[in-house]
Amino acid sequence: MANIAVSHIDHPNLPAPSGTGTFIALFFSAWLALVFFLGARGAFVAQRGAPPLALLLGLLGPLTLFLLAYFTIRPVREFILSADLRLIVGMQAWRWAGLGFLTLYTYRILPGIFAWPAGLGDMAVGITAIPVLASLLRKPGFAGGKRFVAWNLLGILDLTVAVSIGALVPILAPNLYGAVTTAPMSQLPLVLIPVFLVPTFLMLHLTALFQSRRLAS
């Protein structure tokens, strides 16, 4: 099994069909441009106490398309299964920038009930991405193990908790935030986090899990 993993990571045996990578790059570019356009028009802003439906749609829409494409479009599935796991894990290291949530809390831009779990969770995933990447480089078969799966599941849990707090607290306890709310997360530039970066990081975790499952089978 380790030999299979080495072959897959160092010399992928599922080369993506020609043009698939270009198509996916264009999709991400168009998605990012759409987020900027809608964000500039205030399309993601919700009334105080109302559910942030536009934000949730912006998060779940691309994620749903990703899953549908994986399970129904073979070239996309092959592209995902041939992606370099080292790059995928390395990109998660950027989540150490969750420190920014704590900075925004310090300046009373975001509430602590959201900023602390979101910030610390992202920082934990970003920092631990380094030893996970080191394990992959040292032993490619690590990708098919339980610890690799657990790390990705924890990364997904962190994002899920942050999104849940941001979405549910304004509905269930609209006065809990006080004067400082999560409203800035629905406006540029912070809106890029829930409707672009969060789904992108979730896609990376899912890609890693799909590959891990294949390697372990």
Regions found by a protein language model. Give the residues of each.
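Alpha-helical transmembrane segments of multi-pass membrane proteins
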Residues: 28-43
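Membrane-proximal helix-loop-helix units in multi-pass membrane proteins
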Residues: 90-148
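A glycine-rich, hydrophobic loop/mini-helix early in the fold
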Residues: 46-110
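N-terminal membrane topogenic signal
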Residues: 12-28
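Hydrophobic cores of alpha-helical transmembrane segments in multi-pass inner/ER membrane proteins
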Residues: 58-70, 124-133, 192-210
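Hydrophobic alpha-helical membrane-insertion segments
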Residues: 147-164
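Short, membrane-exposed interhelical loops at transmembrane-helix boundaries
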Residues: 172-192
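Membrane-interface helix-boundary motifs at transmembrane edges
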Residues: 13-17, 45-48, 74-85, 138-147, ...
